Swiss-Prot record:
Reactions performed catalytically: DNA(n) + a 2'-deoxyribonucleoside 5'-triphosphate = DNA(n+1) + diphosphate; Exonucleolytic cleavage in the 3'- to 5'-direction to yield nucleoside 5'-phosphates
EC numbers, comma separated: 2.7.7.7, 3.1.11.1
Oligomer and partners: Heterodimer of a large subunit and a small subunit.
Presence of the UniProt keyword Transferase in the record: yes
The organism's taxonomic lineage, starting at the top: Archaea, Methanobacteriati, Methanobacteriota, Methanomada group, Methanococci
Keyword annotations of the record: DNA replication, DNA-binding, DNA-directed DNA polymerase, Exonuclease, Hydrolase, Multifunctional enzyme, Nuclease, Nucleotidyltransferase, Transferase
Domain of life where this protein originates: Archaea
Family according to the record: Belongs to the archaeal DNA polymerase II family.
Name this polypeptide is given: DNA polymerase II large subunit
Underlying gene: polC
Presence of keyword Heme: no
Record organism: Methanococcus maripaludis (strain C7 / ATCC BAA-1331)
GO biological process: DNA catabolic process; DNA-templated DNA replication
Amino acid sequence: MLHVSASKGMTEYFKNILDNVTELYTLADDCRKSGYDVTDHVEIPLAKDMADRVEGIVGPKNVAERIRELVSDLGKEPAALEIAKEIVEGKFGEFGREVGAEQAVRTALAVITEGIVAAPLEGIAHVKIKKNNDSGEYLAIYFAGPIRSAGGTAQALAVLVGDYVRKNMGLDKFKPTEDEVERYGEEVDLYQSEVTTFQYQPKAEEIRAAVRNISVEITGEATDDVEVSGHRDLPRVETNQIRGGALLALVEGVLLKAPKILRHVDKLGIEGWDWLKELKSKKEEVIEEIEEEKDDFNYEEEEDLSQYEDYEVEAVTKFIGEVIAGRPVFSHPSKKGGFRLRYGRSRNTGFATDGFHPAIMYLVDDFMAVGTQLKTERPGKATCVVPVDSIEGPIVRLKDKSVLKIDTVEKAKQYRDDVEEILFLGDILVNYGDFLENNHTILPSSWCTEWYEKILKSENLEYKKEFIENPDQKEAVNYAKLTKTPLHPKYTYFWHDISKDNINVLRNWIIGGKYNESNDSWEVTYDSENPEISNAKRYLELIGCPHTVTGEKLEIFEYYPLLYSLGYDFDEKRDIVEEIEEKLQNTKNNMHFINTIAPFEIRRNAYIYVGARMGRPEKAASRKMKPPVNGLFPIGNAGALVRLINKAVEEGKTDEIEISNVKCSCGNVSLYRTCPFCGNSVEPSGPSRIKLPIKEYWYKALENLKINKAGDVKCIKGMTSKDKIIEPLEKAILRAKNDIYVFKDGTTRFDCTDVPVTHFRPVEIHVGIEKLKSLGYLKDIHGNSLENEDQVLELKVQDVIVPESCMDYFFNVSKFIDDLLEKYYKKDRFYNVNKRDDLVGHLIIGMAPHTSAGMVGRIIGYSNANVGYAHPYFHASKRRNCDGDEDAFFLLLDAFMNFSKRFLPDKRGGQMDAPLVLTTILDPKEVDGEVHNMDSMWEYPIEFYEKSLEGIAPKEIKKIMQTVEDRLDKDSQYEGIGYTHETLKIDEGPLVCAYKTLGSMMEKTSAQLAVAKKIRATDERDVAEKVIQSHFVPDLIGNLRAFSRQGVRCKCGAKYRRMPLKGVCRKCGSRLILTVSKGAVEKYMDVSQTMAEKYEASDYIKQRLEIIRSGIDSLFVNDKRKQVKIEDFFK
């Protein structure tokens, strides 16, 4: 019985997934019962909803049903508090006081975070009941580093939950001493100077106020090897080191999220938090700036000229504060010629992913590939690059001084080597939902065809769709004149980017030309040596009007709208503007002037240009540990640095390591639960140091698999898990045979960048029509039967489109699973694939590294792009958006058969990125709430565009927009989601970012600055300075410091903080080597100084580099010994 609202078709889809999950679970469980694995059962519990996930990850037992009841009646946050109260009251079993309090806090936090992230497990080390100096008892919550994965709001609510638990247990408030209060301030300062900066920088008084007023102690375990110097050895603080988890909960939780805490406090009626109101009022402006990045708008309003008002928006410079070497800046903040803001959503955008014309992706020398992350100016901090070919492409000036609109990929490839300057980068397509999510003011929309069509509809005017999409220039002008409507966006130039005086200079030059009937163009004289003509030519470039230069002749083929816009009647061959100087004098600005001289209304083409720089490149690669290994079978140092067990066997080597083992009755040492020598069931007693019988286990494994000779098999040196229980060697051999690698938990994974897609064409995913029909894709978005590969289909929410390289890797994984079934478990092969396409329809798990819950998915095809396409709901189910992060896929049967909790490292964070529970059916209500703000409309109403000019808050127009939130708990929550802009191919554009193909850092920075040089919206000198200041200088200084503090290591793996007195390894006697080399210290020195000279960096930067150079030379250059050439002696 499904617990979600869904149509008949979607119900059948979910039933099919559940049946397949059950089939795989049964098969894996049957294999496990053979006794060859760590346990006799599959170790991944299945969860149908959030309540099951919470019980599966943190418990207590039988809590799931009560969570469902409370969430249904009260809502998520009140339910979390109530379940915490019931736990400490003993309704789910008798716990000790501290154990009960800890269980209550963990369970409540798990409810708040939907039972997905690892924070309830790993982010809370423990909860203790401690004593104040007056002997009263209070509650202390020990936070750890992984609490970060919960997010600021959940961190703050964890403290609120702790206070609620404290009250219900009848405990006193935490009463800190002055030393303890000041300790927090010292730790915050030290954390920011030595570790990393917080999202919010609190003042000392705010920290003191919070610590004195919060009723529970926010403390934690040491997370960083940095000690306080002032407030040390405090009786109630167990460490002198920084407590990173506690600081995160205090600063990015309570202090940063104060307004949200107050809303919950008021809503839930919790007392004792009134002190936050004063803190909120003092810091509200700063907090809003961080959370909302609200802009300042300045208007100059005058009577009936308001439509021509000057519009300014304050540039947001935060994204460009740090520029990484080799990663270009595409546009400086709000710089003219940058990405023009356009509203809407394509089938492959939304949920923090923005659309760009694929042509610009090629013109920036392939630095924008499909899936490349960009750090952006607004509305959010980052986005992912995807192609949308229905928006405006770039405008470029060629080396012959001609100007072209590059509106196709073919043109981009044809002219890419001839581009001298990119005058306009094209549109950035951002959906309303991203503004709503970031609570960012709705900025004025660009003048676009969808707005234009809305105006024509509102005035009940007749038009053809072809006219909206691609009108003839004369048709566009005459339609505007006849209907008194604004000029079509296609022929609306960037008049606002030049002054009205510039417009007049351009006008005088243009109307002085003549019509060339032979090629239907307008010709003007061009002389690059003439300053006046050169200036006029530049103005023509800046407004984005295409033209061709041939010798001393400049031809304009879009002459009709240009001439009329400049007040020249082409048909009558006359200037229709009278008293031009008076109009120049009396008009308010450029847009007022151009509208005064033109016979029709001309709208402002762009209000907002968005700045952006490259973040990280796209990724699609198999997950490998460092170094990569085939199995979790430890061999110590017997395999040398390459860790090859077959080499150790050949050379007769072994090693003594700590491992779980037991002496079997047959006389042999068994490392498994079933003795490989006699078949008896044994139970390893626990870890102890033994001399590993590598040779015996190797040949026994080959015998079991009926393999005469295996190739290279890489193994680990030792287990980091608590019990040191190992994986059977047979699995390592079979993985190596199939060229795949293992992760820490026994699974084999593939990582790729998250990209959303709600609709696809069969041709894009390399799957036949009949196969898609068998997977439930019967009709396209228009209700027509699926018949050809170009029809658009709506993606089902748990279906994924993986990269082509992922299919190849999973093809090998499936061969490994089948070999494992046949050769090791003596079962029938399951996948039986002959080619990668045979994997279509099989189930996988999708998982983010900061979580402990996986989501079942189904492969329905693969794309050429190096990204993982999935429904926005699917990404949200992993607590991810799509701003450039990467997650993992792995085959479901692989996880069921090979995953074990007992392989996981016994350290803080060890249980993160492990499928401790698996969600089988995706419920949109229980995914990350950000996706609820994504709009799901087929078109935006005209009111949206009109209201955008007013600079209003996104919530003010939510009633006229439709978002995912409006569809929840209805059958339509899974189907019928719309999009406003079409794109021909979701994987059009460069597939590999240039950053990944270039070699040395010198090559990368040269390419980075070459891109900056040819983009009008970018200043290459500023880019060079920022690269040096924000990347090279900190790296050089950091490496210098690391060199002076470094330890030494040995080839056997031993590491020493200081050189031993003997001067050799105490373990094996070998020579010790440095961990930081000279090359690592000075690797950026030469490139930094070369850049500083070439791009004329400031004297300050040059001098700073000289100081660093002298510091490096003082370490590595001997002033007393100088190498000379033989001829120097004859001088």
